């Protein structure tokens, strides 16, 4: 049996033969960490089995019992509590988070992706999607049937929003509570494996969004078993996950084991770690270092490249600095600064955290494209303090930062979930896309962005607890009332119409102007593959210049240029060297350069070589 540090399940199949009568299946060892319990009972397929303490591991309980490795249902009863509790390391919750657990034999799935050698992050383009709203059906199988669209688009990695179980049928996924299992309405463990297998057959890698900083408010039974949470620290979700208090060794192993299971048992290629700035850890070896080392070890064992992407709002280079250089060892992180610069420059919005970026948006955009972050130790009015730290442009590869025009957060956390594409001129959308896809960072698209989807992506929930549902509903309306929104204008998260209205409309890409924008995205992705300058990792080699009053910006990638005019007047834009070729333009009527300058029409984009 593998050690727990490599992510073994609490339920593992032994190599013993079937019982003599052949009716009860092979012996399984059931393991449970419940350090505060005095007695633990395993209930397996209706039969009770007392568990014994593990003499070698304090707090652990063991039981060996015959079970069907892919069908048996089970749970645990602690002391005199009559409630049957699901396994914290359950691989399947067929009846949801509140029901019994079910064994899953990961070895039984027949993979067809044997030749798959993995997909590295450098040079790749990610596509973020939510299983429940990507298709009308909202399942893994339905999403797999749309993968050819992503192949034709030209992306490399599909990033799934969280898929762990949560109460109800639909939600964003960030209220998951069974961190080793898969949401049944999506298709359960088998459905996720079929999706990954289908993606790999098409040459697409898969990234999974995982949440370690909190669990959902309903269906979370971990505190019944042990000190999974601590009051030493507090987060926006309440008590912090216990990463540094007594008992934290086991909690950290629990989270690392969950992460490794996705990479090993489901053959996922990378993980996106939600809000790592909320992982409060005062220990000498940070949890992220431990996780990074474990993933690196698994990658060496499997022969596949595996990677970790963090969501961090710290603007701290340590997050993406290798462990051997004193960093936390993540391979990349999201860069909200680039999004905020683009959003402010394209829309003119200046509320809340857009304020600093809207003062001189094109200057800020040029700064961010060349330095990695806008706030790199500068004053941040939204926080009321200085924020961030400079990146070492000579040592930090640009692909360690993700750049994007839309994300689930930046769309869904708006009051009405309206996309930037719902009201913005397609020519401006095309300019924003060009700066992301020819820019220095690892690009990421949000589902439907490629055709300028007009459908919103709103905040939706399906909480089964009426009190919790009402608290979420009133809390969201109260939040946006502070920004001037009337309560009736904020969609009800619990309304089925909010969820259904957030699904993509797959007829849009066949109509104008959506079809033209989709063709532009395909052109940009093809250019990125064909011209190594656009994937050059040297951040120090990136140059950008902008004119705030005339509303133009030119991005230099070696001998390549991306020039955008965001204004309403034609502008003569300097290219810095005579142009030799036009590679792409939007709209197509943009004229050819005249030597080292280019007359750009209003709201237009030109990409070429000098």
Task: Report residues per predicted region.
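The feature marks proteins involved in alpha-glucan
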Residues: 1-29, 48-50, 55-128, 135-138, ...
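Short proline/glycine-enriched turn/loop motifs at strand-loop junctions of beta-rich domains
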Residues: 33-39, 569, 577-579
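C-terminal beta-strand-rich structural cap/linker in extracellular carbohydrate-active enzymes
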Residues: 34, 70-71, 593-610
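Substrate-binding/active-site clefts of carbohydrate-active enzymes
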Residues: 114-121, 130-301, 307, 319
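Conserved alpha/beta catalytic core and glycan-binding cleft of carbohydrate-active enzymes
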Residues: 288, 292-485
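Glycan-recognition and catalytic regions of carbohydrate-active enzymes
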Residues: 374-389, 445-446, 451-460, 482-560
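Asparagine-centered strand-capping/turn motif at beta-strand->loop junctions
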Residues: 563-567
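Tight coil/turn sites that cap or link beta-strands
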Residues: 580, 586, 601-605
């Amino acid at each position: 049996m593998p050690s727990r540090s490599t992510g073994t399940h609490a339920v593992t199949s032994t190599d013993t033969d079937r019982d003599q009568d052949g009716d009860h299946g092979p012996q399984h060892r059931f393991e449970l960490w419940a350090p505060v319990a005095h007695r633990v009972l395993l209930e397996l397929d209706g039969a009770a089995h007392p568990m014994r303490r593990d003499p070698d591991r304090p707090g652990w309980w063991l039981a060996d019992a015959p079970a069907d490795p892919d069908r048996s249902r089970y749970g645990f009863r602690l002391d005199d509590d009559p409630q049957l509790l699901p396994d914290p390391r359950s691989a399947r919750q067929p009846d949801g988070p509140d029901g019994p657990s079910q064994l899953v034999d990961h070895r039984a799935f027949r993979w067809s992706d044997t030749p798959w050698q993995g997909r590295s992050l450098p040079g790749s383009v990610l596509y973020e999607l939510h299983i429940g709203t990507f298709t009308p059906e909202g399942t893994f199988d339905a999403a797999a049937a749309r993968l050819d669209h992503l192949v034709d688009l030209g992306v490399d990695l599909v990033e799934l929003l969280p898929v762990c179980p949560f109460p109800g049928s639909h939600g964003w996924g960030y209220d998951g509570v069974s961190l080793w299992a898969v949401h049944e309405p999506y298709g359960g463990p088998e459905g996720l494996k079929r999706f990954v297998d289908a993606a790999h057959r098409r040459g697409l890698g898969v990234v999974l969004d995982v949440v370690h900083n909190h669990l959902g408010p309903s269906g979370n039974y971990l505190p019944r078993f042990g000190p999974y949470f601590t009051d030493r620290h507090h987060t926006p979700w309440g008590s912090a996950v216990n990463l540094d208090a007594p008992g934290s060794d086991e909690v950290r192993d629990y989270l690392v084991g969950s992460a490794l299971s996705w990479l090993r048992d489901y053959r996922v290629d990378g993980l996106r770690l939600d809000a790592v700035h909320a992982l409060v850890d005062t220990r000498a070896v940070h949890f992220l270092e431990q996780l990074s080392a474990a993933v690196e070890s698994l990658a060496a064992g499997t022969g596949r490249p595996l990677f970790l992407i963090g969501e961090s709002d710290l603007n701290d280079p340590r997050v993406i600095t290798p462990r051997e250089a004193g960093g936390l060892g993540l391979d990349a992180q999201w860069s909200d600064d680039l999004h905020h610069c683009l959003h402010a420059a394209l829309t003119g919005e200046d509320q809340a955290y857009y304020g600093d970026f809207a003062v001189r948006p094109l200057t800020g955009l040029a700064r961010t494209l060349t330095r990695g972050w806008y706030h790199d130790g500068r004053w941040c009015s939204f926080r009321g303090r200085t924020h961030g730290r400079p990146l070492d442009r000579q040592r930090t590869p640009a692909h360690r930062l993700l750049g994007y025009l839309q994300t689930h957060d930046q769309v869904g956390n708006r009051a009405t979930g309206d996309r930037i594409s719902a009201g913005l001129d397609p020519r401006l959308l095309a300019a924003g896309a060009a700066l992301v896809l020819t820019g220095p960072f690892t690009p990421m698209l949000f589902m439907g962005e490629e055709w300028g989807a007009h459908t919103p992506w709103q905040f939706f929930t399906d909480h089964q607890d009426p009190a919790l549902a009402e608290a979420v509903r009133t809390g969201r309306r109260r939040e946006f009332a502070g920004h001037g929104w009337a309560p009736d204008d904020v969609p009800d998260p619990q309304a089925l119409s909010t969820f259904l209205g957030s699904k993509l409309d797959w007829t849009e890409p066949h109509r104008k102007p959506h079809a033209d924008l989709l063709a532009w995205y395909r052109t940009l992705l093809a250019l990125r593959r064909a011209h190594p300058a656009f994937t050059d990792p040297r951040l120090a080699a990136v140059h950008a210049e902008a004119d705030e009053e005339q509303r133009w910006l030119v991005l230099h990638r070696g001998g390549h240029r991306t020039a955008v005019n965001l204004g309403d007047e034609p502008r003569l834009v300097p290219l810095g060297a005579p142009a030799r070729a036009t590679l792409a333009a939007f709209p197509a009527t943009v004229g050819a350069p005249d030597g080292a300058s280019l007359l750009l029409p209003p709201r237009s984009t030109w990409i070429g070589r000098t």
